[in-house]
Amino acid sequence: VKVTVLLEELLAAGHAGAEYDAWLINIGSGDQFGSGFVGANPNSKIPALVDRSGPVPQRVFESGAILLYLAEKFGAFLPTDPAKRAEALSWLFWQMGSAPYLGGGFGHFYAYAPFKIEYCVDRFAMEVKRQMDVLDRNLADREYMAGDEYSIADISIWPWYGALAMGLIYEAGEFLDVASYKNVQRWTKQIAARPAAQRGRMVNRVMGDPATCLPERHDAGDFETRTLEKLVAAGEWPKAG
């Protein structure tokens, strides 16, 4: 989601060179272990990017690296002032280090583990609430994560923590008391209202409201003609094989 949100934001800002193809990688079928994908990401994890705009294709893997690469390539969504840039990068890398505790830690033990282990749930819940408090305090006196400028810091944090703040993942909103983080709630809704963020969130989704799922994106027109709803109606989904 982070990468497609940034790509859609770049296109919306007039950077035509950010036009992209988003292929669906079926991790349930093991697509990520195929030689084609491993060539893009030797760690066999999504996302991965291959930039073919230059004389030699450039691979970039890990979402933080991709966001930074694109922001620098297009000179957008990353402050140029050294102090503001450092603040934005600090929050970008905060997300890289913090999100595993949310997804792989709390999310796993609270929602997916075959049986509940109270200590694990409580330990990771405490950490996630601490993280939400960090975000909430930071947003108390600034519009965006790094100040008054929307940046890749926001784009990196919003998909995970924004979804958590709105109670959209793990059915844990009440358990974590997410409604109490008022500043995160305000920030989440502000970004969710951005058309580019809405489009980016649709890309490569195959679960949820079919009208807001776009399994693959190869052209801007796909948002109107190739949603999951349209593919199912046309008998083109699920794909053969």
Regions of interest found by a model, annotated:
Residues 1-122, 126-129, 143, 229-241:
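GST-like domain detector, emphasizing the conserved glutathione-binding G-site
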